[in-house]
């Protein structure tokens, strides 16, 4: 039987499995259960981390990776074109409200582009973003404080302070048309009141005539890889000839890192002991999984040793025997692994709210992770 017919080898492997279908069914179930165990474990672990990150993002007011602060138009274009930057979102703040009904939670009046609005949880769920004239969008909490019914086209009169905390010029009162709104998040640090770019430019020209410096424009960024966020942003500054230090001269572009990301916190406070503990934990998990799977195949192959010996006596080469066993392993994995991954993800997704309910955050902030690391684990 010293032939090179791979089709014959595959057929023999399949028929060998079918001949001992009860034992192999147990092997498939064992593989599926092992995959379920590790998949559900990693799903819960990564989902807890994702839930914590989302909770922090809501407290901060956004989930962009970081912000290049007070940039000019030329600097914004240069940063957006850098290969480490995947996407950018621009925001120009023209004023604020921090008295009266907004004394507890202040409001910021600003222009946000589509990316910035999405990353800041300020994209209208009803209506559309401000496009022209005196259109405005805000959250339902701000509308309630202003005594305005959420209705498209509603007229809203706002009195806000032009400028920012470092420079204030005068109060301005204007009547806006409500173009959209979104649900208020109790965790949000501010009320975002978004106006159109044309209105922001008009107020900026008015403020410049009154002697104010140009309004602050921040560039929020999403990086290609959310690892070592500060290091990557400093590299962008360095490559473009900017300094992130406040006393770096005229060409300063300061950096703000979103500390809601676990990778950002680890990058700044990582120590050798933490790294070694993490590596040891992963090695333990991988080794445990290896032992479980090894024992499954050991039991399966041991039961067929006599059969393989008979095949060898009639001319099957050691190489062909390895192929037969390899094909059996592939078939068993193909049957058990996808089932275990799907069931494990489902179990993990179902357990996440239960686990989160026993934390200080509660089940209401649970976010099920979809990280590819779950299946790779």
Q: Would you name each region that the model predicts?
A:
Residues 17, 28-32, 283-286, 326, ...:
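Residue-level signature of the transmembrane alpha-helical core
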Residues 33-40, 44, 285-289, 293, ...:
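Hydrophobic alpha-helical membrane-associated segments
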Residues 13, 17, 36, 40, ...:
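Juxtamembrane interface helices immediately C-terminal to a transmembrane segment
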Residues 288-332:
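Interfacial "coupling" helices/loops that link adjacent transmembrane helices in transporter permeases
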